[in-house]
Amino acid sequence: MKKNTLSAILMTLFLFISCNNSGKGGDSASTNPADESAKGPNLTEISKKITDSNAFVLAVKEVETLVLSIDELAKKAIGQKIDNNNGLAALNNQNGSLLAGAYAISTLITEKLSKLKNLEELKTEIAKAKKCSEEFTNKLKSGHADLGKQDATDDHAKAAILKTHATTDKGAKEFKDLFESVEGLLKAAQVALTNSVKELTSPVVAESPKKP
């Protein structure tokens, strides 16, 4: 959902809430049973739900950006160095610094996931992403003998962070699981936000008058 669209929705909610809460002096509460028989959506509750859902989506997108950064490093930077002429040039089997960077990003991913608000409807997706993140970070750490040296080989680096590599025993399998779990979490969060917005258009429900 675009930021401008969400801002417009929240502004409209604010105006509706302000109008509903304003009165012309005295008791503004309706005493007409017909008024009480028609109930629309609770705008205050929906406004909070939309705001919370949007904040959650933005937080997950931050995590997604970090995951994608590791994916880009894996696809483009293994066995490479900065070159003045072509941008990147071959530097085989010198991947220690690159892997240290990937590990640092992985710990940040775990940290950000641990701070996510535990929304009840997304608790399964949140728990899965947290588990995958911890497993990926621990896998990199446990492989420090091969991954923690400056002359870490290209094959070892690919086995650690390239999710499409044939050998994935040093972390790439766990990274693929993390990648997919964060994708799933983001999609679920976006659906939750969309559903919150849809509540604004829910039809007014007319209740049957209560018998005296």
Swiss-Prot record:
Lipidation (S-diacylglycerol cysteine): C19
Membrane topology, from the record: Lipid-anchor
Compartments (UniProt record): Cell outer membrane; Cell surface
PROSITE patterns noted in UniProt: PROKAR_LIPOPROTEIN
Highest taxon of source: Bacteria
Main location: membrane
UniProt note: phenotype after gene disruption: No change in ability to colonize the tick gut, greatly decreased migration to the tick salivary gland during feeding, about 800-fold reduction in transmission to mice. No longer binds host I.scapularis Salp15 protein (strain ATCC 53899 / 297).
Pfam families: Lipoprotein_6
Induction description: Poorly expressed in vitro in strain N40, expressed for a short time following mouse infection, then it disappears (at protein level).
Secretion signal span: 1-18
Keywords on record: Cell outer membrane, Lipoprotein, Membrane, Palmitate, Plasmid, Signal, Virulence
Lipid-attached positions, N-palmitoyl cysteine: C19
InterPro entries tied to this protein: Lipoprotein_OspC, OspC-like_sf
Cellular component GO terms, alphabetical: cell outer membrane; cell surface
Leftover remarks: The causative agent of Lyme disease, the bacteria has an enzootic lifestyle. Larval ticks are infected with bacteria during feeding on infected hosts (mostly mammals) which retain the bacteria during subsequent developmental stages. It is transmitted to the next host when it is bitten by ticks. During tick feeding (which can last for several days), bacterial migrate from the tick midgut to the salivary gland where they are transmitted to the host. This gene is encoded on a 26 kb circular plasmid (cp26) in strains B31, N40 and B.afzelii strain PKo; it is probably encoded on cp26 in the other strains given here.
Subunit architecture: Homodimer. Binds to tick salivary glands; antibodies against this protein cause a decrease in Borrelia movement to the tick salivary glands during host feeding. Interacts with host Ixodes scapularis salivary protein 15 (Salp15). Interacts with host I.ricinus salivary protein Iric-1. Binds human (host) plasminogen.
Purpose: Major immunodominant protein in mammalian hosts. Required for initial stages of mammalian infection. Exploits its interaction with Ixodes scapularis salivary protein 15 (Salp15) or its paralog I.ricinus Iric-1 to increase mammalian host infection. Binding of bacteria to Salp15 or Iric-1 protects them from antibody-mediated destruction in vitro, due to interaction with this protein. Preincubation with Salp15 or Iric-1 allows bacteria to infect mice that had already cleared a B.burgdorferi infection, showing it is important in bacterial colonization and dissemination.
Family to which the UniProt record says this protein belongs: Belongs to the OspC lipoprotein family.
Protein name: Outer surface protein C
Annotated organism of origin: Borreliella burgdorferi
